[in-house]
Amino acid sequence: MKHNLNAHEARVIGCLLEKQVTTPEQYPMSLNGLTLACNQKTSRDPVMELSESQVQQTLDFLLKKHLIRSQSGNRVMKYEHRFCNSEFGDLKFSPAEVAVITLLLLRGAQTPGELRTRTNRMYEFADVAETEETLKTLSLREDGPFVVRLAREPGKRESRFMPLFSGDVASSLLAAGEAEEDNHTLEANPRETHSFENIALEKTALEARVAQLEQQVIQLSRRLDDVLIQLDD
């Protein structure tokens, strides 16, 4: 089952995934440690300035979703994720997939080349081709898709990939498409309302939204089956 995260939840989960691999001696993490990780000035996009109360509120929501769990330390409460590869979780990812998903949660849409360079503390990709293969796998998994390929921006050599763990993905893509249309209209013939890049971007957004709706239908069907079983009992 694919999780639906808001921006703060994505940041917290991303930080837990990152620190579990890069600084295992500091994992599970305290509220203070998580707040510092969420607000890092490097390796984060956008840079956030979350208060401890905001991070705590996010942790409370994630606890209710069973995406993290808490444990009492010597002096403070500590938290670890149940986002993937946990004993009772549905999502299972390889180390390469975890690295890619973590960077996408922490920094948003990125190219395969950027991901290969930035994941080196979590996983050492042999080359860009291996990174692209990992992204392809994540986009085609039966329990996904977990990433979506965006239309290549004019003048760019590589397309960027975006994570599909947010309900706002489709609207973000469409907004980007509208911005592309505005720029194109200013530079080209005013009668042209869509560029090829914009059409491709809107198509990607619609495909992403359809995939999200399909997952929601599956989840609702499972819940309905559980209710019917309880009624039969």
Swiss-Prot record:
Q: Which SUPFAM superfamilies does this entry report, sorted A to Z?
A: Winged helix' DNA-binding domain
Protein name from the UniProt record: UPF0502 protein YPTS_2082
> Gene3D superfamilies per the record?
Winged helix-like DNA-binding domain superfamily/Winged helix DNA-binding domain
Q: Which family does it belong to?
A: Belongs to the UPF0502 family.
Extract the Pfam families matched here. Answer: DUF480 (PF04337)
